[in-house]
Amino acid sequence: KDRFDLWCGLDLSDYGRSSFVKTAVEELKRCHKMGAKGVGEVTDKGLGVYVAFQTNMAEGIHLNDPLMSPIYETCAELGMPLNIHVAEPYWMYLPDDKYNDGLMNGKKWKIDMSIPGMQSHEQLIAQFSEAVKNHPNTLFVACHFINCSYDLSIVGRLLDEYSNLYVDMSARFGETASIPRYMKKFYTRYADRILYGTDNGMSAEMYETTFRILETDDEHFYVPDYHYHWYYSGFDLPDEVLRKIYRENFIRIMK
């Protein structure tokens, strides 16, 4: 219990009924009483809100929907951060052609925009931003750099605008390790707002790769399991930045 925190999901089983909000809030309070410290991974990849590893989706309800507001406010009252997965990497919205630089993953995880009601990447990011703005007392942790690693200025702008927003780096090492100088500046500027994360299993090799990228100045190495054609380079982050992203930021938001 000294090494792990318990988090919970959301009960979306009453979606479509008038009891939807009441059920979700009551279950959230019950989980908190049982020891849950946070909520997540709450996800919207375009068709509606759901929670990872659960079968219920609130189809058509997106992160800025008024029905989500009581849930966010309850999280604020209980001091429970929300881990949010919004959209997918931008390559997954692009055509499967030679101009798609992330085709290796983009084709496998392709977002089908022909599905009725499917939200675009831009719509999803705007909806998430509105939710963060409208609930300043709720702490949001957007995983995967808000799925904006293709243009981290978007992440920086949102971090500048909303003090209740944090991001994690999970599963976005391959997308960022090709621009080490930019990333060193980005991590240093937002060192108080970034959390370490992986989302790539539990192997020692995986962790060693993330440490190599964050901590060393190694250049031009390859990680085949990351499925990208470019080489990686280390960010050589200062110790003070590493302490924050590995440990101190998490301790602060969980108080």
Q: For each predicted feature, which ranges?
A:
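A short, flexible N-terminal coil/short beta segment enriched in small residues
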Residues: A87-Y99, E130-N134, T138-H144
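Short helix-to-loop capping/linker segments positioned immediately adjacent to catalytic or ligand/cofactor-binding
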Residues: E59-L63, I115, A142
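Generic structural signal for well-ordered alpha-helices
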Residues: A24-L28, M68, Y72, F128-V132, ...
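Short charge-dense sequence patches
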Residues: P81, G102-K108, K133-N137, Y196-N200
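Residue-level signal for alpha-helix termini/capping positions
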Residues: H32-K33, E73-A76, K133, D160, ...
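Active-site gating/metal-coordination segments in enzymes
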Residues: K1-K110
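H/E-rich (His + Asp/Glu) clusters that bind or coordinate divalent metals
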Residues: P116, E122-E130, N137-K255
